[in-house]
């Protein structure tokens, strides 16, 4: 269940080309905008998860709704998928056409782990999961 205490925080990509965060509902999504006219409808694409880009891709907002019917493996799969999209955008911002496979793998791993951690923090029992 989504925690009412979760507040999205920006994470900075390796080499600081972009920032990314995870939101779980419209209220959290709206918190990220100074001007409410700039915001969109939460999960407007109707997918299991999605990432939207702002400021030319320098701000990436991953959206993931209620996951009570999904397994943790399924959630991690969705977040990993979105991590790859974030990496693809960062790669463009860096001007990298053919990064080494290790550089690419470590970058995606870092982004995915950040998203996994944010997901855990966003769940009502997130702190219990970290200590067990």
Q: Can you annotate each of these PLM segments?
A:
Residues 71, 75, 97-100:
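Short alpha-helix boundary/capping segments
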Residues 69-70, 95, 105:
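Acidic-and-aromatic substrate-binding clefts and catalytic sites of carbohydrate-active enzymes
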């Amino acid at each position: 269940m989504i925690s009412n205490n979760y507040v999205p925080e920006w994470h900075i990509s390796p080499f600081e080309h972009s920032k990314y965060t995870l939101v779980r509902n419209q209220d959290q999504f709206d918190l990220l905008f100074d001007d409410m006219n700039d915001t969109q409808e939460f999960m407007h694409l109707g997918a299991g998860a999605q990432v939207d880009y702002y400021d030319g891709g320098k701000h990436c907002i991953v959206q993931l709704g209620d996951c009570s019917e999904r397994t943790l493996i399924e959630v991690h799969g969705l977040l990993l998928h979105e991590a790859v999209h974030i990496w693809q955008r960062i790669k463009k911002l860096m001007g990298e056409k053919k990064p080494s496979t290790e550089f690419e793998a470590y970058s995606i791993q870092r982004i995915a782990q950040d998203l996994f951690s944010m997901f855990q923090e966003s769940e009502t029992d997130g702190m219990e999961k970290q200590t067990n």
